[in-house]
Amino acid sequence: MVAAAGPVSAKDKVHYLAVHVDDSNPATMNLALNNVQNVRTYYASKGEKAIVEVVAYGPGLKMYMADSPVKARIETMALESSEVQFSACANTHRKMSEKAGKDIPLLVEAKMVPSGVIRLIELQEGGYSYLRP
């Protein structure tokens, strides 16, 4: 017979969030980052952990370009916590680079994933909650 598991303590509680950005509007980018910060602050106040991945594709990939209007915020968030990841769609990056006739550099904080849409599917299938600001 298997014994019942004991209660989960707050320090063991982990929340997973996938944030979807496909809009080049700086207000949307800032809202996404505000949501990330608010979620992490809320759970930290309860002694719990929040692991977040921000996935950008399509026009939202501008969030990770060198001239991003939220570049400083992304750099700061990445330095503050390894529990926030930034994922960039390789499909979008390839198409934007082809259109520009040159490789478009992205922020070092953004890791390339083969497809932003597929990454969001994988995260949700893995138990992540989904948010599209």
Task: Report the location of each language-model feature.
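C-terminal segment of classical bacterial N-terminal signal peptides
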Residues: V2-P7
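Histidine-anchored nucleotide/phosphate-binding helix
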Residues: N30-S45
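Surface-exposed patches in mature extracellular/periplasmic domains of secreted proteins
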Residues: A44-E53, A88, R132
